[in-house]
UniProtKB/Swiss-Prot annotation:
Name of the featured protein: Small ribosomal subunit protein uS4
Biological function: One of the primary rRNA binding proteins, it binds directly to 16S rRNA where it nucleates assembly of the body of the 30S subunit. With S5 and S12 plays an important role in translational accuracy.
InterPro entries: Ribosomal_uS4, Ribosomal_uS4_arc, Ribosomal_uS4_CS, Ribosomal_uS4_euk/arc, Ribosomal_uS4_N, S4_RNA-bd, S4_RNA-bd_sf
UniProt cross-references to CDD domains, sorted A to Z: S4 (cd00165)
GO cellular component, one term: small ribosomal subunit
Domain of life: Archaea
Keyword terms of this UniProt record: Ribonucleoprotein, Ribosomal protein, RNA-binding, rRNA-binding
Species name: Pyrococcus abyssi (strain GE5 / Orsay)
Pfam families named among the record's database cross-references: Ribosomal_S4, S4
Binding partners and assembly: Part of the 30S ribosomal subunit. Contacts protein S5. The interaction surface between S4 and S5 is involved in control of translational fidelity.
GO biological process, one term: ribosomal small subunit biogenesis
Amino acid sequence: MGDPKRQRKKYETPPHPWIKERLDRERVLMDKYELKNKKELWKHETQLKNFRRRARRLLAARGKQAEIEREQLLARLKRLGLLPEDAVLDDVLSLTIEDILERRLQTIVYKKGLARTMRQARQLIVHGHIEVNGQIIRSPSYLVLKEEEDTITYARTSPFANPQHPERMMIEKAKQGGEA
C-alpha cells in the first residue's frame, strides 16, 4: 500500500574527518575485526549510540510505558548476547564498540575455528559456506543471537561440509598446532 519509504543512511559519519586519535582507533578496529571499510564500523557505532541514547532516555523517564520499553531494550540486548542475564539498564551505558563487533557472524565464525583468519571467515560467509540455524547467511555483519551461536556450521550444500575437504583439514591442523 502506497510508496515504499525513503532509503536512509544507517550510519552517522564522524563530525570531523581528520582527528588523529579517532583515525588511529578506527584503524586498530578495522585491522582486528577485518572490516571492509569505515562505513561498516560507523554502522555499528551508530547502532551502539542508538542503544545508549535509548537507555539514557529511559533512565530519565517515568511511567508504565517507560518500564515496558526498558524491559524490551534489555531483552533485545540480552538476546543479542551483548548483556548478561542479570544486567540492568545502567549496563547498557558501559557497552563498547568491541562488544558489538564481537557479536558479528564474521568474528564468531573465526572464534569457533571454522576459518583460519578473519578474512577467510568473511569470504566463507559471503560465498555462502556458512549457515546459522539452518539458513545460509551471506552478511558478515549479521549480529548473531545468543541462542543461534551454537547452530553456526558449514552449510550442508557447501564443499566444506565434508570433513575430508583439504581446506578444512588445514584448519583442523592449525587448531591443533595452536593448542600444542
